[in-house]
Protein backbone atom coordinates (compact mmCIF):
# COMPACT_ATOMS: atom_id res chain seq x y z
CA UNK A 1 0.00 0.00 0.00
CA UNK A 2 1.32 3.46 -0.90
CA UNK A 3 1.80 6.20 1.68
CA UNK A 4 -0.67 8.26 -0.34
CA UNK A 5 -3.44 5.67 0.09
CA UNK A 6 -2.75 5.36 3.82
CA UNK A 7 -2.92 9.17 4.12
CA UNK A 8 -6.19 9.19 2.18
CA UNK A 9 -7.76 6.63 4.52
CA UNK A 10 -6.66 8.71 7.52
CA UNK A 11 -8.34 11.80 6.09
CA UNK A 12 -11.53 9.85 5.32
CA UNK A 13 -11.70 7.98 8.66
CA UNK A 14 -9.63 9.91 11.24
CA UNK A 15 -11.55 8.34 14.16
CA UNK A 16 -10.57 4.83 13.03
CA UNK A 17 -7.01 5.29 11.76
CA UNK A 18 -4.68 6.06 14.67
CA UNK A 19 -1.90 7.89 12.83
CA UNK A 20 -1.33 9.83 9.65
CA UNK A 21 1.67 7.63 8.75
CA UNK A 22 2.54 3.96 9.45
CA UNK A 23 4.47 3.04 12.61
CA UNK A 24 8.25 3.35 12.78
CA UNK A 25 10.50 0.27 12.83
CA UNK A 26 11.40 1.07 16.45
CA UNK A 27 7.75 1.07 17.53
CA UNK A 28 7.03 -2.09 15.53
CA UNK A 29 9.92 -3.87 17.27
CA UNK A 30 8.82 -2.66 20.73
CA UNK A 31 5.29 -3.98 20.18
CA UNK A 32 6.46 -7.32 18.75
CA UNK A 33 8.80 -7.80 21.71
CA UNK A 34 5.78 -8.01 24.04
CA UNK A 35 4.74 -11.39 22.60
CA UNK A 36 6.02 -14.82 23.55
CA UNK A 37 6.38 -16.54 20.18
CA UNK A 38 8.08 -19.68 21.50
CA UNK A 39 4.99 -21.84 20.87
CA UNK A 40 1.83 -21.71 18.71
CA UNK A 41 -0.34 -18.73 19.69
CA UNK A 42 -3.76 -17.40 18.78
CA UNK A 43 -3.46 -13.68 18.09
CA UNK A 44 -6.08 -11.07 17.21
CA UNK A 45 -5.04 -7.70 15.82
CA UNK A 46 -7.44 -4.74 15.79
CA UNK A 47 -6.96 -2.07 13.13
CA UNK A 48 -3.94 -3.49 11.30
CA UNK A 49 -4.24 -0.79 8.64
CA UNK A 50 -1.68 -1.40 5.91
CA UNK A 51 -0.13 -4.24 7.92
CA UNK A 52 3.22 -2.93 9.20
CA UNK A 53 2.79 -4.55 12.64
CA UNK A 54 1.10 -7.56 11.07
CA UNK A 55 4.11 -8.38 8.90
CA UNK A 56 6.46 -8.33 11.89
CA UNK A 57 4.11 -10.53 13.95
CA UNK A 58 3.95 -13.03 11.08
CA UNK A 59 7.73 -12.96 10.69
CA UNK A 60 8.24 -13.81 14.37
CA UNK A 61 5.31 -16.06 15.22
CA UNK A 62 5.45 -19.85 15.47
CA UNK A 63 4.57 -21.59 12.16
CA UNK A 64 1.46 -23.14 13.77
CA UNK A 65 0.11 -19.87 15.15
CA UNK A 66 -3.11 -18.26 13.91
CA UNK A 67 -3.69 -14.57 13.33
CA UNK A 68 -7.10 -12.88 13.06
CA UNK A 69 -7.03 -9.37 11.61
CA UNK A 70 -10.02 -7.15 12.47
CA UNK A 71 -10.11 -4.26 9.98
CA UNK A 72 -13.28 -2.16 9.80
CA UNK A 73 -12.17 -0.11 6.78
CA UNK A 74 -13.28 -2.05 3.66
CA UNK A 75 -10.46 -0.77 1.44
CA UNK A 76 -7.78 -1.63 3.98
CA UNK A 77 -9.40 -5.03 4.58
CA UNK A 78 -9.27 -5.75 0.84
CA UNK A 79 -5.61 -4.74 0.78
CA UNK A 80 -4.87 -7.16 3.62
CA UNK A 81 -6.75 -10.01 1.91
CA UNK A 82 -4.76 -9.48 -1.25
CA UNK A 83 -1.43 -9.21 0.57
CA UNK A 84 -1.89 -12.27 2.79
CA UNK A 85 -4.04 -14.43 0.51
CA UNK A 86 -1.45 -17.24 0.36
CA UNK A 87 -1.11 -17.65 4.15
CA UNK A 88 -3.82 -19.97 5.52
CA UNK A 89 -2.94 -19.03 9.12
CA UNK A 90 -4.35 -15.54 8.62
CA UNK A 91 -8.02 -14.52 8.60
CA UNK A 92 -9.13 -10.99 7.66
CA UNK A 93 -12.38 -10.01 9.38
CA UNK A 94 -14.20 -6.88 8.19
CA UNK A 95 -16.27 -6.22 11.30
CA UNK A 96 -16.23 -4.32 14.58
CA UNK A 97 -13.61 -5.48 17.08
CA UNK A 98 -16.35 -5.85 19.72
CA UNK A 99 -17.45 -8.97 17.82
CA UNK A 100 -14.24 -10.72 18.91
CA UNK A 101 -15.89 -13.50 21.02
CA UNK A 102 -18.37 -14.29 18.24
CA UNK A 103 -15.65 -14.38 15.59
CA UNK A 104 -13.41 -16.60 17.70
CA UNK A 105 -16.28 -19.05 18.09
CA UNK A 106 -17.04 -19.01 14.36
CA UNK A 107 -13.38 -19.88 13.67
CA UNK A 108 -13.44 -22.76 16.16
CA UNK A 109 -11.27 -20.91 18.69
CA UNK A 110 -12.00 -20.80 22.42
CA UNK A 111 -9.48 -18.16 23.55
CA UNK A 112 -6.83 -15.78 22.25
CA UNK A 113 -3.34 -15.69 23.69
CA UNK A 114 -2.88 -12.07 22.66
CA UNK A 115 -4.93 -9.16 21.38
CA UNK A 116 -2.95 -6.27 19.91
CA UNK A 117 -4.45 -2.95 18.88
CA UNK A 118 -3.50 0.37 17.37
CA UNK A 119 -7.04 1.72 17.07
CA UNK A 120 -7.42 5.11 18.82
CA UNK A 121 -9.29 4.26 22.04
CA UNK A 122 -9.16 7.90 23.17
CA UNK A 123 -11.70 8.83 20.47
CA UNK A 124 -14.23 6.18 21.55
CA UNK A 125 -17.33 6.88 23.63
CA UNK A 126 -16.72 5.59 27.16
CA UNK A 127 -19.45 2.93 27.05
CA UNK A 128 -18.11 1.45 23.81
CA UNK A 129 -14.56 1.56 25.13
CA UNK A 130 -15.48 -0.38 28.26
CA UNK A 131 -17.59 -2.88 26.32
CA UNK A 132 -14.64 -3.59 24.03
CA UNK A 133 -12.34 -4.05 27.03
CA UNK A 134 -14.85 -6.51 28.52
CA UNK A 135 -14.98 -8.49 25.25
CA UNK A 136 -11.19 -8.58 25.05
CA UNK A 137 -10.84 -9.70 28.66
CA UNK A 138 -13.34 -12.55 28.27
CA UNK A 139 -11.63 -13.67 25.05
CA UNK A 140 -8.13 -13.99 26.52
CA UNK A 141 -6.94 -17.37 27.78
CA UNK A 142 -6.95 -17.64 31.60
CA UNK A 143 -3.21 -17.60 32.30
CA UNK A 144 -0.51 -15.14 33.37
CA UNK A 145 0.94 -14.79 29.86
CA UNK A 146 -2.21 -13.79 27.94
CA UNK A 147 -2.39 -10.07 27.33
CA UNK A 148 -3.95 -7.13 25.54
CA UNK A 149 -1.21 -5.02 23.92
CA UNK A 150 -1.81 -1.47 22.69
CA UNK A 151 0.20 1.35 21.14
CA UNK A 152 -1.47 4.72 21.64
CA UNK A 153 -0.69 8.44 21.67
CA UNK A 154 -2.14 8.71 25.20
CA UNK A 155 -2.20 6.24 28.08
CA UNK A 156 -5.73 7.15 29.18
CA UNK A 157 -7.03 3.62 28.61
CA UNK A 158 -5.35 2.52 31.84
CA UNK A 159 -8.06 4.38 33.73
CA UNK A 160 -10.77 2.25 32.12
CA UNK A 161 -9.06 -1.15 32.06
CA UNK A 162 -9.95 -2.16 35.63
CA UNK A 163 -10.53 -5.78 34.63
CA UNK A 164 -6.81 -6.27 34.07
CA UNK A 165 -4.84 -6.74 37.31
CA UNK A 166 -1.33 -6.24 35.91
CA UNK A 167 -0.15 -3.49 33.55
CA UNK A 168 3.25 -2.67 32.05
CA UNK A 169 3.90 0.46 29.98
CA UNK A 170 6.75 2.17 28.15
CA UNK A 171 7.03 5.26 25.97
CA UNK A 172 8.41 5.17 22.44
CA UNK A 173 9.79 8.54 21.35
CA UNK A 174 11.13 7.16 18.05
CA UNK A 175 7.79 7.36 16.28
CA UNK A 176 5.64 10.09 14.73
CA UNK A 177 3.76 10.75 16.92
CA UNK A 178 5.43 9.24 20.02
CA UNK A 179 3.42 6.34 21.43
CA UNK A 180 2.81 4.52 24.69
CA UNK A 181 3.17 0.75 24.38
CA UNK A 182 1.07 -0.78 27.14
CA UNK A 183 0.44 -4.41 28.06
CA UNK A 184 -2.66 -5.39 30.06
CA UNK A 185 -2.30 -8.92 31.44
CA UNK A 186 -5.32 -11.18 31.93
CA UNK A 187 -4.03 -12.46 35.27
CA UNK A 188 -1.71 -11.29 38.02
CA UNK A 189 1.46 -13.26 38.61
CA UNK A 190 -0.27 -15.08 41.48
CA UNK A 191 -2.89 -16.33 39.00
CA UNK A 192 -5.78 -14.08 40.08
CA UNK A 193 -7.74 -12.41 37.30
CA UNK A 194 -8.72 -9.18 39.07
CA UNK A 195 -6.99 -7.27 41.85
CA UNK A 196 -10.19 -5.60 43.03
CA UNK A 197 -8.89 -2.02 43.02
CA UNK A 198 -8.36 -1.48 39.30
CA UNK A 199 -5.15 0.50 39.72
CA UNK A 200 -2.99 -1.69 37.47
CA UNK A 201 -0.14 -1.84 39.97
CA UNK A 202 2.17 -3.93 37.81
CA UNK A 203 3.76 -1.03 35.94
CA UNK A 204 7.45 -1.37 35.12
Describe the predicted segments one by one:
Residues 3-38:
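Class I SAM-dependent methyltransferase Rossmann-like catalytic core
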Residues 40-49:
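Conserved class I S-adenosyl-L-methionine
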Residues 51-55:
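Glycine-rich SAM-binding Motif I of class I
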Residues 66-71:
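Conserved SAM-binding motif I beta-strand of class I
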Residues 76-106:
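S-adenosyl-L-methionine
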Residues 130-142:
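A short glycine-rich, Lys/Arg-flanked "PGG" loop and its adjoining helix->strand segment in the class I
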Residues 142-151:
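Conserved beta-strand signature within the Rossmann-like core of class I S-adenosyl-L-methionine
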Residues 171-204:
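Core SAM-dependent methyltransferase catalytic element
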Amino acid sequence: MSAALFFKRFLQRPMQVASIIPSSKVLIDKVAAKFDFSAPRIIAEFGPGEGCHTREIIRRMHPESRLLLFELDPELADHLRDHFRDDSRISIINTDAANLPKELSSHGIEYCDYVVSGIPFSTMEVGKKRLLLQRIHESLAPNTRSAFIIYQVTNELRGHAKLFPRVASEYCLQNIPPMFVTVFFKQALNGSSHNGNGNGNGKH
